[in-house]
Amino acid sequence: GKLDTRVKGIPVVLYNASGFKATDVVTIEVEASRFPKSVAVYNEQGKLVVSQLVSYTDGKVRLLVEATVPANGYAVYDVRLSGEGKEMSAVEAASVENSFYKLTLNENGDITSLFDKRINKELVKAGKAIRLALFTENKSFEWPAWEILKETVDATPISITEDVKVTLCENGALRKTLCVEKRHDDSFFRQYIHLYEGVLAHRIDFTNEVDWQSTNALLKAEFPLNLNNEVATYDLGVGSVQRGNNILTAYEVYAQYWADLTDANGSYGVSIMNDSKYGWDKPDNNTLRLTLLHTPKTKKNYAYQDRQDFGHHTFTYSLVGHVGALDVVQTRENAELLNQRIKAFVVGKHRGELGKSYSLAFSDNRNVLIKALKKAESSDEYVVRVYEAAGKQAQKASIVFADNLVAAVEADGTEKTIGKATFSGNRLEVSVNPNSIKTYKVRFASNKKVQTVAEPLPLVYDKKCFSWNEFKAAANFESGYSYAAELIPAEMNVHGVPFKLETREELNGMACKGNVLKLPADCTYNRLYILAAAASDKDVKGIFRVGKYVQEVIVPSYTGFIGQWGHTGHTEGYLKDAEVAYVGTHRHSGEGDQPYEFTYMFKFAIDLPEKATEVVLPDNKDIVIFAATLTDVAATSVCPASELFRTANKCNRYQTESSTERVNILKQDMVMGYSSYVNEKEKPAFMVDGDENTKWCAIAEMPHYVDFDLGGERSINGWKLLNAAGENHSYVTSSCFLQGKSDKNGEWRTLDYVSGNGKNVLNRTLNKSESVRYLRLLVTQPMQSASGKDVRIYEMEVYE
């Protein structure tokens, strides 16, 4: 709240995370009751800037603003909406132009002409087209996900020509946009071709939305250019490299943000930038191709990868034409801006000592770019990382900060001090060799920490969650696993909120069972923060009650992934919208460390109304609280007004248990056969008795199996195993089959199988519903060790 956000209209704070002053066309969404007739936007100096209304959806107006924001800084803009208008209706079109370019499409929606008006030059090679190029043979039998074969890229790709539709969907002062829709078999493509005016007039953006369902296929963006050079330049992140045309040993090559083809005579060039793709090839002197999607044809090796890249994709690539030689520094800035867009936030109106614009740090030499600016991991210093961008000679620069410095040192990449640094006032003097990186740590003169008014709220701990290296089996947070105590600090500060954890006693977690947290007498705090996680391999829901106020939260699992890519038939893409407070690099089991089995704690905020006396916790024992802190939070309003994090998922989702409780159809009297068991207390029937404290145990020769008669045809959709990690992780079933049949005398057929499992709780969903009367659990590797022969399963469930 230190910026001055007092404006006439809607205050919008713009944030530029790049290390240079950035001017960009920013997309902003603000709430409105209707689509307005007009919009006026003013910068931090009160000057009118160019803006454009785009659309109205779900009570929000989307608009474009040409904005300038200082390096590593903020600017307050004033957005004013007025009147009531109508959105533009899309119209058929085959060309679009701005002050720099005229672009023409053919009947396939491919660009057959791109004319640079500045020097009257056609950029597309005669008889060719800038297009999405589809290779319809993509064999890769040995390493399918990793290797594209030269015979594939040597083939002639086709254009995508089915159901082509081209419309002009935007036609404003800042941006004009063609929307190209087309299809190839089951794959659908929507491409927005954006031409800008003003500061981005030199750049053409291609924003793509693809629903990809093409097998044995490779998709590239193809740029056949009216340029001639055997050599192209490719970005390496820090530095660049020149490469020639495709050869047998180098035909699919990598680059980070951009690649450039400049004519051999140096008169003109084209840079291709992108926000998420890294594979390129150059088949001839005129053409650059960017790899977009790769679904190989497979055989025995990694056969499942024949559906790789299936699903929904969003990505952007951009074209910039430049007169004269390649300016590497300018191209780096252009590409950085594409990848690190200016972010927008709608805020409340208030005074602020920092004014309406603020920059934390910038470089006074355009060849020395600030790559990172962050708090130090283990001190009160700040880390600034710079690199030399031109790649020609050593450079000196001053990094100018918003505050005076009292200390500065040179550091390595791990933030360890390695030498002295020169500074004076608010300037850090740096010297960097070509294409090199330097890291520094600085301490500011006014290095005052913002103190949060806070008080820890005592908890009644009843669960052993953390275990030490010497006693890894002493705790059982979930299924025999525990947090690694040696990683957990006694105190933690999470985004300004302090927490105190119990790290000395055996009990260090509080399971939620509808219990009550009493607030201090005459409590004046207005918010309760908690650290919590779900003692489950799934995310769980819980309801907190404060008087008549009810707040539902989703508490993510303590382990697993925060997000993952989807792979059709195997995994579902997701990204959990949760505030991660703690990450542990491994967890403990009874038999030792489990590296890369990450553990988490999450921060949640519970608002407290005036005169609140208690908080009723959820009635869900899988929600475990580790610490709680009462705070007095100033009323502030900050809402994202632009996309903060781009994901290919159409929506973010938690991996929660189904809202409809699943019923296990297996009963003890359904057991009709088995391989063996140890004793009367460990018979197969105890695996389906609903008691997690009893089990089926067998130690005879393999394979182990249990057969069930369901009493009639049932439609099976999923199943679950609870293994024996509570005894020892080595007892977790590694490989097994779920088999079924309808005829008692028929052959068993496999409904699902698991190989290399390490999870104690195994939840499976079948690819399709299977109708059977008889089921068999066939265990082929009952332990983590391939030589282990003993099976121990506490519960088995099967669902319709």
Annotate the PLM regions.
Residues 222-225, 398-403, 540-549, 729-744:
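Short, surface-exposed beta-strand/strand-loop-strand elements in extracellular ectodomains
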Residues 447-660:
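N-terminal/edge-of-domain interface segments
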Residues 517-525, 533-538, 622-657, 682-750, ...:
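Aromatic, loop-rich ligand-recognition surfaces of beta-strand-rich domains
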Residues 559-569, 653-689:
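Predominantly extracellular/luminal regions of secreted and cell-surface proteins
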